[in-house]
Regions:
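Extracellular/periplasm-exposed beta-strand and loop segments of Gram-negative cell-envelope proteins
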Residues: 83-85, 121-137, 166-172, 205-233, ...
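Bacterial Sec-dependent N-terminal signal peptides
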Residues: 1-24
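Residues that define the transmembrane beta-barrel architecture of outer-membrane proteins
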Residues: 64-66, 138-143, 171-177, 193, ...
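Transmembrane beta-strands of outer-membrane beta-barrel pores
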Residues: 74-78, 161-165, 183, 201-207, ...
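Outer-membrane beta-barrel biogenesis signature
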Residues: 19-118, 192
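Short loop/turn motifs that connect adjacent beta-strands in outer-membrane beta-barrel proteins
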Residues: 58-66, 81, 169, 184-197, ...
Length: 328
C-alpha cells in the first residue's frame, strides 16, 4: 500500500512539474513578446504624435467673426535613420533565440523589410517565425481636411480629419479639434506694427496599426497578427506672426502631452492563444509623454485662397503644405 501511494505521488509530482514548466515557458514567451513590442512600436507612435502636431494654426491674426476656411493639406513626415532599427541579442530573451546568431539588427515599425528568425521550444514543439517588417518608407505622407470658423471676441475653432491612410505594412488615421484666441487685439502697439500674437490649444486622436506576427503553433495561432496604438494628445501652441503685404510669417512654440494605449489582435478565423494574455501585459508599455517642438509657417493670400507651408522641428522633422478657401 505504501509503495502504491509513493508511486501515485511520483506520477502526480511529474504532472505538476510539467505544468509548472509549461507555465514558465508561456510566461517567458509573453515577456519576450512584450520586450519586442516595445522596441518595435514605440518609435512609430512617437512619430505619429509629431505628425498630428503640425500646422494647426492658419494665422496668428484675429479671425473675422463667422469667417469660414476649408483646406486640403498634405503632411510629409521624414523618418530618421535612428528610429528605423534596433539591436537584439540572445541575452535579451528568455524564451526565444536568434537562429544562427547571437546578435542581430532588426527593423522597427518605421524600418525596412529585413528579417531574422526567432526560435523557441514550447512543451517540445518548436516555435519559429520571422521578425516583423517595417513600413520601409523614408517618408510618410497622408492627406487630411481642415476647417476653421471665426467666433466672437477673437476666438476661432478648428477641426481636422483624415481618412485611414494605407501604409506599406499598416495604416494611420488622425482627427481632432482646437480653439485659438488672439491676444494682440488687446495691444494697439502690436497691431499698428502688424504683429500678431495668439495661443491655441488642440486635442487630437491618432490611431496607427501595423502587421505584427502571424505565428501558428499546435496550440493555435499566437493572436499577434496586428499591433494597434491609439494616442490621445493635447497640444498647446504659442504663435507670433508678422504681416508683409500678402504674406504672413508665423513662428510657434508647441508643447504636447500624449497618452498611449496599445492592443494586439489575431486572425478572427483562427483561435488566438496569447491575444488576451499579451493585451493584459501591454499596459506596462503605456506611458504619458511630453514633447516640445518649434514650427515655422509661411502663408500667402491671393483672392479668396491662401497657401500655407509649415515646417515643424524637434525630435523629428515634419513638413506640411495646404491650400485653403475662405468664405466671408
Amino acid at each position: 500500500m505504501l509503495k502504491r501511494s509513493i508511486f501515485i505521488l511520483i506520477i502526480l509530482s511529474g504532472f505538476v512539474s510539467k505544468a509548472q514548466t509549461l507555465d514558465e515557458q508561456i510566461g517567458y514567451l509573453l515577456s519576450d513578446a512584450l520586450f519586442y513590442s516595445d522596441k518595435y512600436i514605440v518609435p512609430a507612435t512617437d512619430a505619429a504624435v509629431y505628425q498630428a502636431s503640425s500646422s494647426w494654426m492658419n494665422s496668428a491674426k484675429k479671425k473675422e467673426k463667422w469667417q469660414f476656411d476649408l483646406g486640403v493639406h498634405a503632411n510629409v513626415f521624414f523618418v530618421p535613420n535612428r528610429d528605423r532599427k534596433f539591436a537584439i541579442s540572445n541575452s535579451d530573451f528568455q524564451f526565444f533565440e536568434i537562429e544562427g546568431a547571437n546578435e542581430a539588427t532588426v527593423p522597427t515599425a518605421l524600418g525596412n523589410d529585413n528579417q531574422v528568425y526567432l526560435v523557441g521550444d514550447l512543451d517540445g514543439q518548436e516555435i519559429r517565425f520571422k521578425t516583423p517588417e517595417g513600413i520601409n518608407q523614408e517618408t510618410v505622407v497622408y492627406p487630411y481636411l481642415q476647417a476653421s470658423l471665426g467666433l466672437p471676441y477673437g476666438f476661432e475653432v478648428v477641426g481636422r480629419y483624415s481618412t485611414r491612410t494605407k501604409l506599406k505594412r499598416g495604416d494611420y488615421q488622425v482627427y481632432g479639434f482646437g480653439l485659438k484666441h488672439n491676444f494682440s487685439q488687446y495691444f494697439s502697439a502690436l497691431e499698428s506694427k502688424k504683429i500678431n500674437l495668439s495661443f491655441m490649444t488642440m486635442y487630437s486622436n491618432e490611431e496607427i496599426s501595423f502587421e505584427f506576427l502571424d505565428v501558428d503553433t499546435d496550440f493555435g495561432n499566437l493572436g499577434l497578427n496586428q499591433f494597434t496604438s491609439k494616442v490621445d494628445t493635447y497640444h498647446f501652441q504659442l504663435a507670433v506672426s508678422k504681416d508683409i503685404q500678402a504674406f504672413e510669417i508665423i513662428g510657434s512654440f508647441i508643447a504636447n502631452v500624449s497618452n498611449f494605449n496599445y492592443r494586439v489582435s489575431g486572425n478572427s478565423s483562427e483561435a488566438s492563444v496569447f491575444e488576451s494574455a499579451i493585451n493584459q501585459l501591454l499596459p506596462q508599455l503605456e506611458d504619458t509623454k511630453w514633447n516640445y517642438m518649434g514650427e515655422l509657417t509661411g502663408v500667402y493670400h491671393f483672392s479668396k485662397f491662401f497657401a500655407k507651408t509649415s515646417f515643424t522641428f524637434g525630435k523629428f522633422v515634419n513638413l506640411n503644405i495646404g491650400i485653403n478657401y475662405t468664405i466671408n
